[in-house]
Regions:
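A structural "domain/chain start" motif
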Residues: 2-59, 63, 150, 154-159
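Surface-exposed short loop/turn segments
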Residues: 51-53, 57-110, 114-132, 139, ...
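C-terminal or internal capping secondary-structure element at the end of a domain, subdomain, or sheet
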Residues: 134-158
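Charge-dense, low-complexity intrinsically disordered segments
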Residues: 37-40, 44, 128, 132, ...
Length: 159
């Protein structure tokens, strides 16, 4: 019984490692990204999360950046006339991936995320709640951007 489990686990591990080399070659493009953002706290948080996620793809040639990712992060708060109403925070991001040599836009897209903040009486608590909601939205957007950039890099296109 133990032999069967060991055999099955080796078989599964070998099947899953067949495609890793080609993916690693394509994903090396992620080490060649330069990120530009607007100078808000949330956009800097998104930039740092993306840089930390792609630090493993840095190679000897990654000092020379081939691609520029331009991030434009905007947020808005919707509320009603009532002071203690539920507030909706919407954060949207527009991004472009540009090849530096030819200045060609390779990808241009946008998406948004929403968060609700409950009714709070204290002004300080309301501000803290909005700050925390913005941080959560920033982390959510950065995770989504990481996935989108990995999908872009793994797409089989010669650039």
């Amino acid at each position: 019984m133990l032999f069967r489990l060991v055999f099955i686990s080796f078989f599964l591990m070998s099947c899953s490692s067949l495609n890793n080399y080609t993916d690693d070659v394509r994903l090396n493009k992620l080490g060649l990204l330069e990120i530009e953002t607007n100078k808000t706290y949330v956009s800097k948080l998104i930039e740092e999360n993306i840089k930390n996620a792609f630090a493993i793809y840095k190679t000897k040639n990654s000092d020379e950046k081939k691609y520029t990712v331009i991030l434009n992060v905007n947020d808005s708060i919707e509320s009603s006339l009532l002071a203690n109403s539920i507030r909706k925070i919407e954060m949207s991001i527009n991004y472009k991936i540009i090849e530096k040599k030819s200045n060609i836009v390779l990808l241009n897209d946008s998406f948004s995320r929403n968060s609700l903040v409950g009714p709070i009486n204290s002004l300080f608590a309301r501000d803290q709640s909005e700050i925390n909601a913005r941080k959560r939205l920033g982390v959510s957007i950065s995770n989504d951007m990481i996935v989108r950039l990995i999908e872009w890099a793994s797409f089989d296109m010669e650039t």
